Amino acid sequence: IREEQPYQEISEHDTPKPNTAYGKSKLEAERYLDSIGNNFPYIILRPTGVYGPREKDYFLMAQSIKQHVDFAVGFKRQDITFVYVQDVVQAVFLALDHGMNGRKYFLSDGEVYQSAAFSDLIKKELGNPRMLRIKAPVWVLRIVTFFGEYLGRMTGKMSALNNDKYNILKQRNWRCDIEPAMDELGYHPHYPLERGVKLAIKWYKDNGWL
């Protein structure tokens, strides 16, 4: 959605076009709730890239950087948004108290980042190890994830590099409109990316993940 530059924020009024199995399953759940009508009260939260303790996808990035490699995909501008898990928890409780029935609220930390921002902060928290930053064309990722998906089906173990991961990484616009969450729920993110990454990396270290 809204992949043309200059990128615009995605709002609840845009027609969802999920490109992963996970995203499609969430949309099916939303449509089911919408079909019930007002007889069943519900509120939908749509957090963007959630990170924090126990999260595994961003942990793999941290692990790779610790091993001196950072991998990025695509040469077209990519605007990314994130939300720390504690801010998601805050939004859940606020939605229970103040959310409007049937509404859909996007969640992020309110900022927009370029693709290298997250890995640069991870590198800083790891003590600035030497790092080789590799940026590959999208078609290279397509080949890698194709074989990752194939091997996962053959072995019965899902590869981290699969078709869903390809669709996530190739998307360029992750901007989202959090104004409704702020205005109606009283949501105010407390964890900017630098603080959140610091806490996440500390947890990974303290718990033996890194």
Label each region the model flagged.
Residues E12-T15, A62-V73, N128, M154-A160, ...:
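A short C-terminal helix-loop "cap" of Rossmann-like NAD(P)-dependent dehydrogenase/epimerase domains
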Residues T20, I80-Q86, Y113, C176, ...:
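Residue-level signal for the nucleotide or nucleotide-sugar donor/cofactor binding architecture
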Residues A95-L161, E194, K198-I201:
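Mid/C-terminal beta-alpha module of Rossmann-like enzyme folds, strongest
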Residues C176-E184, H188-L210:
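Amphipathic terminal alpha-helices
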Residues K24, E28-A29, E55-L60, V73-L96, ...:
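Substrate-positioning beta->alpha
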Residues I1, V50-G52, V88:
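Conserved sequence/active-site signature of Rossmann-fold short-chain dehydrogenase/reductase
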